[in-house]
Amino acid sequence: MVSVPVVVRDNKGHALGTLAKENFQVFDKGKSQEIVRFVIEKAGSQTLKAAKTVDALPAEGEAGTPDIPERFVAYLFDDMHLPWADLVRSRDAAGRQLAKLAKTDRAAIYTTSGQNVVDFTDDIDKLQADLLRLRNRSISDPGGIAQCPDISFYMADLIVNKNDTTTLNLAGQEALICLGLPAQALSSAIQMAQGKAQQVLAVGTQETHVTWTVLKDVVRRMAGMPGQRIIVLISPGFISPTEYQPDKNDIMDKAIKANVVINSLDARGLWVDPTIDASLPNTTVTPAFQIAKSMNDRMSASAQADVLAEMAYGTGGSFFQNNNDLDEGMRQLTGPPEFYYVLGFAPQNLKNDGSFHALRVTVKSNPPVSFNVQARKGYYAPKKTSNAAENAKEEIEEALFSREELGELPVELHTQFFKASDKDATIAVVCRLDPKHIQFKKADGRNNNVLTIVSAVFDRNGNFMSAIQKTVDIKMKDETMAKLPAVWALKTNFSVPPGSYMIRLVVRDSEGQLMSALNGAVAIQ
C-alpha cells in the first residue's frame, strides 16, 4: 500500500475538507491507480480521541487521570545552513510562539548540528533558554570557503558532478583576476577553480548528509510520541544532489507511516538576489562571472526552496516562504493543515527493484474549479518483500505509538497503582477481554489463536518509558471453551516513581488479524 497525503487549497489558500474519493485521481508513472484507501484528516480530530480516559471516576487505589499531552511540536533548526541573521530572526519568532504553549502541548528543540537540544517538555523557560544558545554551526567558518573565486555549492555541483565547462571557465576567469594572475596563467586559474569547487562540494555534501540524517532521526523520534506529531523545519533550504533522492523518499515514507507532518519555514523570508542586495559585499570581479553567478544564485535559491517544499507537501504539511512575517509563519506551521487527505493505492505488478515511481495527483470537480494541490512527488519500490510476521510487528508498533483508539476486539483497559513509598510505586495495567467474541481457527479438534498484548508507559511529556509484550497461545478443546469465564484479565506491572503517566494498550489476534488499541492515564501523588 502506498499512502499519499494531499492538501487541497482554494484560491485564497484555505485547506478544503469537502472533497470525496471520486474527486481524486492518482497516477503512478503516468498510469491511473485505483484509490483503495481514502481518509479525511481534520486538525484536532485525534485530540478528541486522546482525551478519552478509561476510569473517569477512579475509586481509592485506582489511578487518577492527569492531563494528557495532545500535540507534540519539534522545532528543527537547520543551524548547519542558517546564516546568523536568519537564525536570530527565526529563533526569536519561535520564542514568541513558545511563550503561548498550551497546557496539552509539548515542544522540543532539535538542531541539524546536534548541539543545543531540548527533548519534549512543557518547561517554557528551559526551551527559551536553549533558543538563546543557538549558533551557526556550519562545517566551514563563515566566509572561510566563499573566497576567490566565490563558488556556491550549486555551482560546485555543476562543475564537479555535471561537468559544466562553461561555469568552470567563468570561475577560472574570476580566479585569474581576483588573484591578480597574468592572462597566460588561465590554465592554472581554472585548475584552482576546479580545486575550490571540489572543496566546496565536499563541505556542502557533508552538510547535506548530516541534515538528512538528523531529519530522519527526528522523524523516528517523533514516531514514538503519543499524539499529533508536527516537525517545523526552520531552514534557508539547502542543495540536495541527486544521490540523496532515496534519503528524501525514505524520510517521507517513514513520516507518512508514523503520521508525522513536516512543515517547512524558509527562514530567508522574502528572498533578495545577492547581486542587488546593497547590504552584501560584491566579491565578483568579472561582469561575465557576476552574471553567471547571479543566474546560478537564483537557480540555487529555487532549488533550496524546492527541498523544503518537497518535505512539506510530501507529508501533508505546509510551506511558508517569501514572507518576512516569521511570527505568522510559526503560528501557521505549529499546527497541521485544517484538512488533508490520505489516498492509498496498491500498485499492480510492482517489481521489488528499488526503482523510483513518479506520482501525480489531480482533483476534478463539477463545475471545474482551480485548486492548489500539494502532494508527494513519488516513492521508491521496495527491494524485498515483507512477510506476515514483519507486517504484524509493524502494525503493533505503529498502533503502540499512536493515540488513535481501535475497537476491533472486545477489550477493556483498566489501571491501578500501588504506592510502596514516597519514591516507589507500581502501575498495574489490566487488559480485560471476552474470549467468546474472538475468532478462533478450528484444527485438530482444538480452537486456535494467538493473542499479542503490549502495554506501554509514557511520562507526562509523552516520552516513551517502557513496554512489555505478552503472547497468549490459545489451543483449547470445545469443552474447555464452554467453561471459560466471561472475562479474561491479564495484568502487567510497571515500577515507576510517583508522577503522571500515559498508558497505551494494544491487543492483536493472529487469526482475524484484528486489533484494539486503548489509552489510559495515571496520576500518582
Per-segment meaning from a language model:
Residues M1-Q525:
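Scaffold/interface architecture of coatomer-like assemblies
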